[in-house]
């Protein structure tokens, strides 16, 4: 692979600088540490990247904006929607480092959309389409959009050659120009062989660490879930590794064996707590990634999620800003779980609530008082009939109970299947809240 020296140097400088002065984390605790504009108080808007459904409204993927401020007259209502003019399996999105733009991708058509959410977050504008991913990289299915200084790091799920799970990461600048690509390793590193699969991305600048996880390719995620689970060969085509990369050089340094499709990655955010946690979809386990006494990264399963024998299918997770708690959604049984992470070596489930017939994404406010859930996983994996609920549900959390705040029925409102959420605040209020560093 050809390495761009200028890119490496920029990564080096960014990483070195941010070890000493890390930019603020934003509202949802899964966002990049390089993002500016921390919302410490009440978020004003929730943006939902939504899958289009044939015959429902205009049938297009769209960005839906909901008023989330209880002081507003339109609290809990859809106040804006912008369609992209087609269906490409809308899935995830991420802010640029300046928090002014949202990049959102389609897992099927690999189109990337850039929305201006900084000028007027109540009415985002679609300003750019990027359709060069497959041609420039050979990857398809852009999943994770992770801000770096002046750059967007994109983790993909599949490849254009055979639509399998071998894939990689790509880097674009904030203007939408392609910069570089990095294949997921398939070689053996430190006695563990890579499977080449990809999914999530998460960075710990203080440890010069970039951690990736693994899922499955287009052939599986665009196929009916019932068919996949009944096909023994298809079930072999899920990721079983995580990769620790050197953030400065963007080279893989260690492969961790984590069987069962490790999905979302969440680093502990308080200074000095240099560990990460993930959940495996197929085996329903929480896994801790942490250095041992020798300074070598290790991954170990530390807790079961629900009853693994019933395959509840853990999907999204959200860590609290103090790293003492973790929300976990299990899709098949529609349950939202809360784990006490006071001892990350031994997480304890202390609360659970049935929140829908199916539930997928979870986002929480920085103070942990508000929790938002959406229902859709993938268009071909969602349930059918009466169990095909499509919603955003907002809750208040007092440390003991989730209390409903408001709900949007996306089917009734002819919007589609809601997936990923991001928060914004009005520019005037956001400006007064910036400048606060996590560390």
Enumerate the predicted regions with their spans.
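Beta-propeller domains
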Residues: 96, 191-339
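Blade-loop segments of beta-propeller domains
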Residues: 75-144
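Asp-box/WD-like beta-propeller blade repeats and closely related beta-sheet repeat scaffolds
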Residues: 118-205
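Short, conserved, GDST-rich strand-edge loop motifs in beta-rich repeat architectures
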Residues: 41, 47-58, 155-166, 213-237, ...
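Beta-rich, blade/repeat-based domains predominating
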Residues: 29-37, 58, 85-97, 135-150, ...
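Loop/turn-rich, solvent-exposed surfaces of beta-rich toroidal or solenoidal domains
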Residues: 309-392
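A short beta-strand motif characteristic of beta-propeller blades
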Residues: 78-84, 127-135, 178-191, 251-256, ...
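Short loop/turn segments immediately following beta-strands, especially the blade-tip
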Residues: 66-73, 114-124, 171, 175-177, ...
């Amino acid at each position: 692979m050809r390495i761009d020296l200028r890119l490496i140097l920029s990564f080096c400088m960014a990483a070195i600088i941010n070890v000493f002065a890390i930019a603020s984390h934003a509202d949802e605790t899964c966002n990049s540490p390089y993002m500016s504009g921390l919302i410490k108080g009440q978020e004003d808007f929730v943006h939902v990247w939504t899958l289009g459904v044939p015959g429902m409204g205009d049938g297009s993927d769209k960005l839906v904006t909901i008023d989330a401020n209880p002081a507003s007259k339109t609290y809990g209502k859809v106040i804006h929607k912008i369609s992209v003019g087609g269906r490409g399996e809308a899935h995830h999105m991420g802010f640029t480092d300046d928090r002014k733009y949202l990049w959102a991708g389609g897992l099927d058509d690999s189109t990337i959309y850039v929305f201006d959410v900084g000028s007027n977050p109540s009415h985002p504008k679609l300003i750019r389409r990027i359709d060069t991913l497959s041609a420039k990289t050979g990857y398809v299915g852009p999943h994770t959009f992770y801000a770096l200084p002046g750059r967007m790091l994109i983790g993909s799920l599949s490849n254009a050659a055979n639509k399998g799970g071998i894939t990689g990461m790509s880097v674009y600048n904030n203007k939408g120009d392609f910069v570089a690509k990095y294949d997921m390793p398939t070689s053996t590193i430190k006695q563990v062989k890579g499977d080449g699969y990809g999914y999530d991305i998460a960075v710990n600048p203080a440890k010069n660490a970039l951690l990736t996880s693994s899922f499955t390719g287009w052939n599986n995620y665009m196929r009916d879930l019932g068919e996949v689970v009944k096909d023994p060969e298809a079930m072999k085509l899920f990721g079983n590794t995580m990769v620790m990369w050197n953030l400065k050089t963007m080279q893989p340094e260690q492969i961790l064996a984590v069987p069962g499709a490790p999905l979302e990655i969440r680093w502990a955010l308080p200074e000095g707590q240099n560990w990460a946690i993930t959940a495996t979809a197929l085996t329903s386990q929480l896994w801790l990634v942490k250095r041992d006494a020798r300074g070598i990264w290790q991954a170990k399963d530390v807790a079961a999620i629900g009853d693994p024998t019933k395959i509840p299918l853990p999907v999204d997770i959200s860590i609290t800003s103090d790293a003492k708690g973790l929300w976990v959604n299990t899709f098949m049984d529609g349950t939202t779980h809360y784990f006490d992470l006071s001892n990350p070596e031994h997480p304890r489930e202390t609360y659970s609530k049935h929140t829908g017939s199916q539930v997928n994404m979870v986002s929480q406010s920085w103070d942990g008082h508000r929790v938002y859930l959406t229902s859709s996983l993938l268009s071909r994996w969602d349930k059918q009939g009466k169990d095909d609920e499509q919603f955003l549900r907002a809750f208040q959390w007092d440390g003991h109970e989730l209390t409903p705040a408001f709900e949007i029925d996306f089917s009734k409102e002819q919007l589609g299947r809601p997936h990923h959420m991001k928060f914004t605040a009005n520019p005037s209020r956001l400006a007064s809240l910036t400048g606060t560093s996590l560390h």
